[in-house]
Structures are given as structure tokens and as C-alpha cells.
Amino acid sequence: MEPIRVIESRTVVLPRENVDTDQIIPARFLKVTDKKGLGKALFSDWRYAADGAPRPDFVMNRPEAQGCSILVAGDNFGCGSSREHAPWALVDAGVRAVISTRIADIFRNNALKNGLVPVVLDAASHAKLLAAPGASVRVDVEAQTVTLPDGSTAQFPLDGFARYCLLNGVDELGFLLAQEADIAAFEGGRR
């Protein structure tokens, strides 16, 4: 994982509520264990017609969505089953942060382990983002703030360990491996 301190990008707004992990990436794409290429399957049933042609009316297929790395989603994003492929697909598609008023716990944990910043904002701040598709927004992981289109900032919660991992570009296993010498010394002292 790459360290993430600040993400500055225009936003893509997907105002649908209760987007579950099967809508993020349908089950037929879960047969792989390689993260690369899963971005093509992101929101597949919404992005593509039955013949595989892109649907021009879907927000992520529009030209103005290209290069955006912040997704503003409706309430209760990532609900449903535990599907690590969902954050894999988002990250592979270039999404670095998802902003909502509520993000499902399992999705949130999987996102953090894969370098995707789950941002939960208060309803008023979130409404400002929903009303301004394509606006430039800044997500500051270190300060735990989002700079909104009007220049105001909103705080978002992030536990200390998750914040440490994002800022240092490590997952839980990477963190433990970095402590190997200390763990060995502790174990050696117990014998």
C-alpha cells in the first residue's frame, strides 16, 4: 500500500442509498484473487448494458468522471456481504476515498486494509457534496478533515490504528512484520 496523507480530486457523485457489495462488484467477478483489472467490473450491472456496451447515462461513464478519485455515495454504502473484492474494484478503478453518511462496518474494515479511505460525514456536509458533483474536494487523512466546495471543513472519524496504517502505507500484517524484532525480544525475555 502507498501512504495516504491527502487526496485532492474532483468528485463523482453516486447518490444511491444502500449500495451493497454485490452492486459494487457482482458475484460473477469474484473468482479471481488478483486485484488488477477488477476496476472494469466496478458497478458492472449499472455501467454496462447486457451487450457489454457502456451506458452513457451512468455517472462513472461520463467524461467528467474520468480521473476523479473521490466517490460521494448515498447513505449506507458497502452494505451486504463481506466481499473484499468491492474495495479492490474501487481502488483499481482509481477511487481513493468514499464519502457517505454511513459506511457498512465490514466494508469499512476491508477498505482500510486495501488503501481506500472510508469517510463518514455529517448529513449537512454530505448534502453539500451531493449538490456539487465534480467539485474539487480535499480529504486530509492526517487532520481527519474534508475541505468542502464552499471552503468549509468537516471532521470525520478514523481510529488511531487505521489512521497510522493509512499514513504509513501499511496494513495490519505489514504493521506486525515491522515489529518483528520487538516481538522476538519480548518472546526471548519470557524464556
UniProtKB/Swiss-Prot annotation:
Q: GO cellular component annotations, sorted alphabetically?
A: 3-isopropylmalate dehydratase complex
**What Gene3D superfamilies would the database entry show?**
Aconitase, domain 4
Q: Name one GO biological process term.
A: L-leucine biosynthetic process
Signal peptide (residue range) = none
* Catalysed reactions, as listed in the record: (2R,3S)-3-isopropylmalate = (2S)-2-isopropylmalate
Top EC group: lyase
Q: What SUPFAM superfamilies does the record tag this protein with?
A: LeuD/IlvD-like (SSF52016)
In terms of Pfam families, this protein maps to:
Aconitase_C
InterPro entries, alphabetized: 3-IsopropMal_deHydase_ssu, Aconitase/3IPM_dehydase_swvl, AconitaseA/IPMdHydase_ssu_swvl, IPMI_Swivel, LeuD
Q: In which pathway does it act?
A: Amino-acid biosynthesis; L-leucine biosynthesis; L-leucine from 3-methyl-2-oxobutanoate: step 2/4
GO molecular function annotations of the record: 3-isopropylmalate dehydratase activity
Could you say which EC number(s) this protein's record lists? 4.2.1.33
Mind listing the UniProt keywords for this protein, alphabetically?
Answer: Amino-acid biosynthesis, Branched-chain amino acid biosynthesis, Leucine biosynthesis, Lyase
| Quaternary structure (record) | Heterodimer of LeuC and LeuD.
Query: What's its job?
Result: Catalyzes the isomerization between 2-isopropylmalate and 3-isopropylmalate, via the formation of 2-isopropylmaleate.
Q: Indicate the family of this protein.
A: Belongs to the LeuD family. LeuD type 1 subfamily.
Name the chain's protein: 3-isopropylmalate dehydratase small subunit
Per the record, the gene is leuD
